[in-house]
């Protein structure tokens, strides 16, 4: 079994090489690695690329954390040195997860929290110190959500309630919350159990592009379900609670923005929060459908924006009356136009076909509305353009099946465009979606071999 050493032991030898033998940091590290490897020691657990102070031989990250701790409680008006130390810690933490773990072990998180608390307790908080501290704690918390604790949450609430001239402090606070949410269900639940949501709601408004994007990201991250350590998460309940506070506000913000990125984030967030039928109805009643159609029509060339719009429409169509309103208000020509404009983009094509699938499911009138736009030929051409893309072929088969299953009068038109050969080729190319394609061929009235997947064997023969 290979021998191992601690990071401190490795760092002490590097320091000795720098101080005692006047080596440069890079020479000292090389020599240390050779020494330990010659002794048969496994260095897999050691951070070998730590920045080292050439004067003291100490790792920069350790020295920086110690210097920040020294500043706490001194209440010095001169903050230049402190800001430099915070910038150094930020830069070191950005290098790798190993650097962040080491900083955390050396007490960087507690030091930054104490520094933030001390700064916030002042009569007029120093915004520069707040910004640099938040930048450092953002870098430190990245992929380390376990560091976020009750003290950190208390600081976040103070920061959200703080009236500052620059919105930079608020943006950094929201980014910190996002990092605390990723892959950590308990953090999400703890955040939802505080007044954070009520403090964030007033921040939503017109002309706040960056703020709206960061806020919507926090709302989405609060409804993640990505923590394998927790058997059951509260994603649905969180979505319901957040929707109750901000859903209508988000819908009302849609006409206020022109930036495609802001609009895409708003649409994505609305779709993420629309987890119940009554919420879908509320979005419809607030004029959400009209806004979405206007956004799609005036931004036909925007890939991400239209993909999110299609996903949102598909989510809203889960409520039958809203599904009817979507089709009645004229979505079919818009989706056809999108398919024509972005026929080479497999992501838009897949999203558009999935949307057609949902909107035409079990409703003959909806199928007719799409068919009358001439979308059949466009769908066939889209399938022809992406023969290797399994999701496009599967979604196309779904869309065709739903359109013709209650409208057999369409079959002849579909077949005249050569869809049968395309589907048969897709079935050979993508065996995993064979059943989906066979369902489309069956409802088109084409020849299809339906194989019996499983046959039982009876102990006694059943008479014919």
UniProtKB/Swiss-Prot annotation:
Q: Where are the ARM repeats?
A: 235-275, 287-331, 332-374, 375-418
InterPro entries in alphabetical order: ARM-like, ARM-type_fold, Armadillo
Does the record carry Phosphoprotein as a key word? yes
Organism in which the protein naturally occurs = Drosophila melanogaster (Fruit fly)
Would you identify the family this protein belongs to, as annotated? Belongs to the ARMC6 family.
Transferase in keyword set? no
Detail the disulphide connectivity of this chain as listed in its UniProt entry: none
Name of the featured protein? Armadillo repeat-containing protein 6 homolog
